[in-house]
Amino acid sequence: MRQSLIYNSIEVIAYNLNRQNNSLKLFELGKIYGKHNNKYLEERRLCISIVGEVFQMNWNIQQSPDTFFYGKGLIIDLFETFGYNNLKFNNVDHPDFVFACEISSQNIILGYYGLVSMKKREKYNIEKEIYLADINWSRFIENCFTKPTYFKDLPKFPSIKRDFALL
């Protein structure tokens, strides 16, 4: 029984890096187990990890964006899709990260995001930076869609754009 998805994610990243897959965007959804105040806990967690270049270089993309902010944007998009609009990232100390942000909404801690510490990466001989998000999926699902979702009918006719040139 595992207590965190972080170590398994780092192991998968090491496996892929050893096989020359240098740019990775991975996720894992699973259960973790633990004990808190003489009670046994079982929680679902979502672990998102990003390593290497975010986009492949081509004529249109000269420089890849900063991986930290790409991951933060990915997390914000995920949360907004499920109805979280007032998301906060607060800097905290976390034993698994060099620097970490606590992801919270309405004073409910939903997870952590940051750069995995060198100590954790050295165990698997990984030199590249690993940005990882550990989201408490059980808590995430309980609190999503607090507002009702509204849908609009699709248009019956396709949109028409006209360009008039008058002389």
Model-based region annotation:
Residues M1-L167:
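Extended beta-strand-rich architecture
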